[in-house]
Amino acid sequence: MNSMYRIYPEKRYRKTLAILQRFAPKGTSILDLGVRNPFSDVMEKEGYVVSNTEGEDLDLHPETLKDYQGEMVTALEILEHLVNPFGVLQQLPAKKLLITVPLRLWFAKAYRNDKDPRDCHYHEFEDWQLDMLLEKAGWQIQYREKWTHPVGKLGFRPLLRYFVPRYYAVYAQRMTND
């Protein structure tokens, strides 16, 4: 296993990076929504030019995205933290988009951190919900992938995590009026 995965979620990072490499050549400039994070470093180590947003409240001010540039936007575990992801998706300053979100699990409650109101999930999508949201916001889906997230614990719910997909990735391109 590569050393970058010793601390981070190995499967999620590996899958996300593989999708990114499939649709964006090295050297692509990427706006990674959210503050700088460990996966921002992974993308840079793989040859991408990465900038991040600065912690703005994108629900209240999605128009601030127009101040950023990038050939591609990544929103990796970001949309579920937004009250209004539709407004953000409309304002993205690129023609290519890679999104990952946690899927809604029928056997688990939505994630909530009582100590940090920014670290809560307003949405845990079903795949069709994210697809509809993207299409309504002007994006055409080119690729989709789901994967499980085993947690290595004992119990009924941890067992289900071996079989029920937890993450959903979508690569999309902005629709044009041509």
Predicted regions span which residues?
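Flexible, active-site-proximal loop/turn residues at the rims of small-molecule/cofactor binding pockets
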Residues: L79, V88, L103
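Short, glycine-/aromatic-enriched active-site segment of Class I SAM-dependent methyltransferases
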Residues: I99-H123
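Conserved N-terminal segment of class I S-adenosyl-L-methionine
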Residues: M1-M72, F86-P93, P117-M132, Q142-D178
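Short hydrophobic-aromatic micro-motifs
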Residues: L98-I99, V170
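Short N-terminal helix/helix-N-cap motif within the alpha/beta-hydrolase-1
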Residues: V83-G87, K109
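Short, well-ordered beta-strand core segments
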Residues: V73, L97-L98
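A short beta-strand submotif of the Rossmann-like class I SAM-dependent methyltransferase core
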Residues: M72-I78
